[in-house]
């Protein structure tokens, strides 16, 4: 275990470094860049050491650099009693060995079983999602069909309105023609009546004038008129012969 003094000594620099790193992580504009969650975990060695640590040492110390650094660090911690080996250390070492054996032996089986369960759950979710997408797509198609039918109903309603308007127009024209025929017939009747009245009036007037004129002519005037007419005709005949 690490000693309490070493932990207290290292606590302040770690806090300052964490504060500086948090301040440096914030962007100048106040926006923080979010990390993306990796799909697969990174590569490790010895079960818990990241591969990036080894790559960092490879460029500077070669292949044996990480292992030399690790052995030297452990030796330094143990020799300076920063890391004290008490009874819990050996218990932890035993548990670590058992855990490593369990991971090596049972890990692949458990991982295979867990992957199968995950695949099963994923397939169920995928089937449910595909079924839901199918239901939604069918609902969309049905809605489009209903909208098309609604548009057809509107067109049918417009056609019915136009048909009714044409029927009303035909009825109006028929009634207007009937009114025109009736008015023309009555006007023709009135015109004919006026013509008959005018002819009757003319006939009565001619008869009245003729009767009065004949009544006013005496037998002597009639005789003189006839003699004058005969004389005029004789003179006209002589003129025609001389010509």
Curated annotation (Swiss-Prot):
Please name one Pfam family that this protein belongs to.
Mt_ATP-synt_B
For this UniProt entry, what is the primary localization, expressed as one broad class?
mitochondrion
Cellular compartment(s): Mitochondrion; Mitochondrion inner membrane
- One GO cellular component term, please give it: proton-transporting ATP synthase complex
Q: Which InterPro entries match?
A: ATP_synth_Bsub_B/MI25 (IPR008688), ATP_synth_F0_suB (IPR013837)
The biological processes this protein is annotated with in GO are:
proton motive force-driven ATP synthesis; proton transmembrane transport
The record's keywords, sorted A to Z, are: CF(0), Hydrogen ion transport, Ion transport, Membrane, Mitochondrion, Mitochondrion inner membrane, Transit peptide, Transport
Q: What family does this chain come from, according to its entry?
A: Belongs to the eukaryotic ATPase B chain family.
Subunit structure, briefly?
Answer: F-type ATPases have 2 components, CF(1) - the catalytic core - and CF(0) - the membrane proton channel. CF(1) has five subunits: alpha(3), beta(3), gamma(1), delta(1), epsilon(1). CF(0) has three main subunits: a, b and c.
Q: Its biological function? A: Mitochondrial membrane ATP synthase (F(1)F(0) ATP synthase or Complex V) produces ATP from ADP in the presence of a proton gradient across the membrane which is generated by electron transport complexes of the respiratory chain. F-type ATPases consist of two structural domains, F(1) - containing the extramembraneous catalytic core, and F(0) - containing the membrane proton channel, linked together by a central stalk and a peripheral stalk. During catalysis, ATP synthesis in the catalytic domain of F(1) is coupled via a rotary mechanism of the central stalk subunits to proton translocation.
- Which protein, by its recorded name, is this? ATP synthase subunit b, mitochondrial
Q: Which organism is it from?
A: Drosophila melanogaster
Q: Which gene encodes it?
A: ATPsynB
């Amino acid at each position: 275990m690490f000693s309490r003094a070493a932990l207290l000594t290292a606590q302040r620099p770690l806090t300052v470094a964490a504060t500086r790193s948090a301040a440096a992580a914030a962007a100048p504009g106040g926006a923080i860049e979010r990390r993306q969650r990796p799909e697969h975990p990174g590569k490790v060695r010895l079960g818990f050491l990241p591969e990036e640590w080894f790559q960092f040492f490879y460029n500077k110390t070669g292949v044996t650099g990480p292992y030399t650094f690790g052995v030297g660090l452990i030796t330094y911690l143990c020799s300076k009693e920063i890391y004290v080996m008490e009874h819990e250390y050996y218990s932890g070492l035993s548990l670590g060995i058992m855990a490593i054996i369990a991971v090596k032996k049972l890990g692949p089986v458990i991982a295979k079983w867990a992957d199968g369960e995950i695949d099963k759950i994923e397939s169920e979710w995928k089937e449910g999602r595909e079924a839901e997408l199918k239901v939604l797509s069918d609902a969309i198609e049905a809605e489009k069909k209903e909208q098309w039918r609604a548009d057809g109903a509107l067109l049918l309603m417009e056609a019915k309105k136009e048909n009714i308007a044409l029927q009303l127009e035909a009825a109006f024209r028929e009634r207007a023609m009937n009114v025109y025929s009736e008015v023309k017939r009555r006007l023709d009747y009135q015109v004919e009546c006026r013509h008959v009245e005018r002819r009757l009036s003319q006939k009565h007037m001619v008869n009245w004038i003729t009767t009065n004129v004949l009544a006013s002519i005496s037998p002597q005037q009639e005789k003189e008129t006839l003699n004058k007419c005969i004389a005029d005709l004789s003179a006209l005949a002589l003129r025609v012969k001389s010509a």
